[in-house]
Amino acid sequence: MIKFEWDTTKATSNKKKHGVSFDEARSVFYDEFAVQFFDEDNSVSENRFLMLGFSDEARLLIVCHCEREEGNIIRILSARKATKNESHYYQGIGP
């Protein structure tokens, strides 16, 4: 079973800035067609990943996260609605 964690202050600011709660963001990990990418540009102190998929509110989101070594824990760092290019990629239209 996957466990999720996040900083509550960051979750509040993310909701204000992007209109996406981390509760909604975690549902993206259950989209069977979600695509995960390694986020090389932001993986300085830890490996970060981007998950692109549909939430349980039928919104296509991109979720930045890292995976904790202790247990099966995903730490959500940020989440936002996917851009037009990201949407095309998810739909198989883009590069």
Residue positions per predicted region:
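Ribonuclease/tRNase effector modules and their secretory precursors
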Residues: 1-95
